[in-house]
Amino acid sequence: MTQPIFLVGPRGCGKTTVGLELARACQSQFVDTDHWLQTKAGRTIAEIVEKEGWETFRALETETLKAVSAPSTVIATGGGIILAEHNRGFMREHGIVIYLCAPVATLVERLEAFPEEGQRPTLTGKPISDEVSEVLAERDALYREAAHHVVDASQTPEQVVSHIVTALRLACAS
């Protein structure tokens, strides 16, 4: 598989964890767009959003997406990358998009276990369970629109990777 693989989904669905495992399984490079952007900017996402706003952050996110897209690369994207139609189109045209789908309860449980508050600024200012439910309701259709494959991410990272590898093999065989 030489095309980039883009992992999309909400906060807490496991894009980074699964992405690292998938890259190992596919003998590919791995890039997390949030991490790459923060390293390049020398600031956290929360700092960028606080000082420059969401619009500036989303523009930087688009630049990052294009900069890291390369053959034989697994790319964990930020949860909101699909908000821009041009990002959804870019990923679909230049690679394979996998939506890591999980129920709200699973996402909330993971986010409460690993809050990483500095990296994950609130999107709505509401309690985490309300925010996750609201954001997923707004974005689920966009994740599905962007995705070539939808994978249940409520399982272990190893199981999720196994399902992705199977889906990719079936896609290549057809």
From Swiss-Prot:
Binding positions (ATP): 12-17, 120, 155
UniProt pathway annotation: Metabolic intermediate biosynthesis; chorismate biosynthesis; chorismate from D-erythrose 4-phosphate and phosphoenolpyruvate: step 5/7
Primary location class: cytoplasm
Chain positions recorded as substrate binding sites: 34, 58, 79, 139
Co-factor: note: Binds 1 Mg(2+) ion per subunit.
Keywords linked to the UniProt accession: Amino-acid biosynthesis, Aromatic amino acid biosynthesis, ATP-binding, Cytoplasm, Kinase, Magnesium, Metal-binding, Nucleotide-binding, Transferase
Alphabetized GO MF terms: ATP binding; magnesium ion binding; shikimate kinase activity
CDD domains: SK
Cofactor field: Mg(2+)
Catalytic reactions of this protein: shikimate + ATP = 3-phosphoshikimate + ADP + H(+)
Region (LID domain): 112-126
Assembly: Monomer.
Domain comment (free text): The LID domain closes over the active site upon ATP binding.
Name of protein: Shikimate kinase 2
Organism: Enterobacter sp. (strain 638)
Gene expressing this chain: aroL
